[in-house]
């Protein structure tokens, strides 16, 4: 998919972002608000895309009355693919035999607009639906202003420069915030307080300061939640840390514990005292957990345990175990 949609209007070339990372703060917050309205049944996926185009171009959708003009906007909007994935029945069973490129295309482009895909007509007859694709690596809301305070509260940072990922989030801060990633709107001030805390991060102080963030507008608080969830999804689907989410649900495994309990485990293993570990970078923390998981699998294999037994002991899928070995 193209990251930008370019078109010519009255001799000038314009560009519309077609990726989360291409949005600015205003565009991000407004799009998140539209997606929330869509989840409440107030907007369709098509109208969300149309509003995105109008927003970027500075057009007032309520003032567009010409049918041809609206048709042209709708044509542009159909090319906007980044906010959604398309889900087909039975966990995308119809896409099972497609190559990787065709699969990705079918997950983004409605079947009625697919070209060069032999099963597009069949797909168009299926009961497919759009779901929000919240997976990206960018901090859109660098700071939050609270009424009555002179200085804004600075949030966590995300940097992907020079093909390297870094973040200011600490292990404890990430753990606390992740517990609230799907929180109700009433808990949004607490989530914001956690993510916009100064370092060194302290859980109790973040809790105490949460009342201050009740003064922040709801659109910003909701966008902050969406932003953090997008980063979580990115970490655990597009980086080396995705292995940490592969454990199959079931009884407790020898290498799977709660994130908070894992802090105590690392302290017992000599990585530092509890405070030192809780203040370490979340990426360092996840890296250690990943390393311990891989070492555990290899240790079990070295003890002559076969792959099936390792899978039963660790609750990791066999394909993941084979990749490790």
Language model features with spans:
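An amphipathic, hydrophobic-aromatic interaction surface with interspersed Lys/Arg
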Residues: 1-303, 315-324
């Amino acid at each position: 998919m193209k990251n930008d949609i370019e078109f010519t209007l009255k001799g000038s070339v314009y560009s519309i972002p077609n990726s989360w990372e291409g949005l600015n703060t205003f565009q991000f917050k407004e799009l998140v608000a539209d997606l929330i309205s869509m989840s409440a049944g107030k907007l369709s996926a098509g109208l969300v895309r149309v509003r995105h185009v109008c927003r970027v171009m500075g057009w007032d959708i309520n003032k567009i009355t010409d049918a041809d003009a609206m048709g042209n906007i709708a044509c542009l909007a159909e090319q906007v693919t980044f906010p959604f994935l398309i889900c087909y029945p039975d966990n995308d069973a119809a896409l099972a035999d497609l190559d990787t490129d065709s699969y990705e295309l079918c997950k983004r482009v409605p079947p009625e607009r697919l070209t060069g895909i032999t099963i597009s007509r069949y797909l168009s007859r299926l009961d497919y639906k759009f779901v929000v694709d919240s997976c990206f690596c960018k901090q859109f809301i660098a700071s939050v202003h609270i009424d009555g305070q002179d200085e804004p509260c600075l949030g966590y940072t995300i940097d992907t420069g020079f093909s390297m990922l870094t973040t200011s989030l600490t292990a404890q801060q990430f753990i606390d915030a992740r517990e609230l990633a799907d929180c109700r709107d009433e808990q949004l001030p607490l989530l914001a307080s956690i993510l916009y805390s100064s370092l060194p991060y302290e859980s109790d102080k973040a809790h105490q300061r949460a009342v201050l963030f009740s003064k922040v507008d709801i659109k910003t608080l909701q966008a902050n939640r969406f932003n953090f969830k997008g980063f979580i999804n990115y970490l655990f689907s597009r980086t080396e840390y995705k292995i940490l989410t592969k454990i199959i649900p079931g009884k407790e495994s020898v290498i799977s514990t709660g994130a908070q309990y894992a802090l105590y485990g690392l302290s017992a293993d000599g990585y530092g005292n509890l405070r030192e570990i809780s203040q370490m970078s979340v990426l360092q923390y996840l890296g250690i957990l990943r390393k311990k998981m891989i070492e555990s699998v290899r240790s079990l294999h070295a003890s002559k345990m076969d792959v099936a037994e390792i899978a039963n002991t660790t609750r990791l899928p066999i394909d993941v175990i084979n990749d490790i070995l």
